[in-house]
A protein has these predicted regions:
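C-terminal nucleotide
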Residues: 3, 10-15, 27, 31-32, ...
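Alpha-helical scaffolds flanking conserved acidic
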Residues: 61-65
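DPxDG-like acidic metal-binding loop motif
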Residues: 36-58
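Glycine-rich active-site/cofactor-binding loop and its immediate structural neighborhood
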Residues: 222
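Contiguous domain-boundary segments centered on the initiation and propagation of an alpha-helix
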Residues: 17-19
Length: 263
């Protein structure tokens, strides 16, 4: 899994009044259900505030990420761990999942590749809400039953992550584009309906070569997506998104991850 933390934030505050009454509040810059990992980020912020972590080294970030994942699971929204890890660590992440263990792989995209993505990657919100746990449930049932199509789709997504990581570290833009397309193929194998809300807008952009690759964010089925615009075509892509009623979101990389301020 390759992911990136961006500068849309979840914030949590914990206060204890003079009578010892504790109150916790949280907010987020983007809607829950948008596919941007908002639930994971909110829970990382919430648990970091409750823990009152004075130091946030790598071990502490891993701890709060896992606590946030387990908290979500208890609430019945069990998905992957990637959103919590991205929120806790910030920046670029290349994650390997082995059972319940998460291994953070060495990963450092070169600046030219990051500048290229910053210039050409369009982030849009369709405004169609989804619940990732609900979307995942049927897929995992099929996986548990030995569905070969689901297994093939998951393998395609896993191999695409390796290709994406290599492409970003070596500025192999052809590999980045191929990785986007392989992820889409893998998702279609899991459930073609996950891409359903996007096709009417995205397919014409692909056919016209205005877009070279794209990806539904989160579980798909609505929420946000990213589109990799061809050189000189970003304005055309943005215009198509806005014509469809989608909201364009400005983004930049957040390299800090979770932080705690005590006062």
């Amino acid at each position: 899994m390759v992911n990136l933390a961006i500068d849309s934030y979840a914030r949590a505050t914990l206060e204890v009044d003079d009578g010892g009454i504790l109150s916790v509040n949280y907010t987020c810059d983007v809607p829950v259900g948008s596919g941007l990992g908002t639930t994971g980020a909110i829970n990382v912020a919430l648990l970091a505030a409750i823990e009152g972590m004075a130091e946030l080294g790598d071990a502490e970030r891993q701890t709060v990420a896992e606590q946030a994942f387990q908290f979500e699971s208890l609430l019945g929204n069990k998905g992957g761990r990637q959103d919590q890890w991205a929120a806790a660590h910030g920046g670029w992440n290349h994650l390997l999942f082995i059972g319940d263990d998460v291994e953070k792989m060495p990963f450092s995209p070169i600046r030219s590749a990051q500048r290229w993505l910053g210039k050409h990657l369009v982030l849009a919100n369709t405004g169609i809400p989804h619940v990732s746990g609900d979307l995942h449930a049927m897929i995992w049932e099929r996986y548990a039953a030995g569905d070969e199509q689901v297994r093939e789709g998951l393998m395609a997504i896993r191999m695409a992550a390796r290709l994406m990581a290599n492409g970003l570290q070596q500025d192999r833009r052809d590999e980045v584009i191929t990785a986007f397309n392989e992820v889409c193929r893998g998702v279609d194998l899991l459930d073609p309906g996950l891409h359903g809300p996007f096709h009417s807008v995205v397919d014409p952009l692909l056919e016209a070569r205005n877009v070279l690759g794209w990806k539904a964010l989160g579980a798909g089925g609505g929420g946000c997506l990213v589109l990799l615009a061809n050189m000189g075509r970003r304005e055309l892509v943005e215009a198509a998104c806005e014509a469809a009623g989608w909201t364009l979101l400005e983004w930049d990389i957040d390299s800090e991850g979770v932080s705690v301020n005590a006062s």
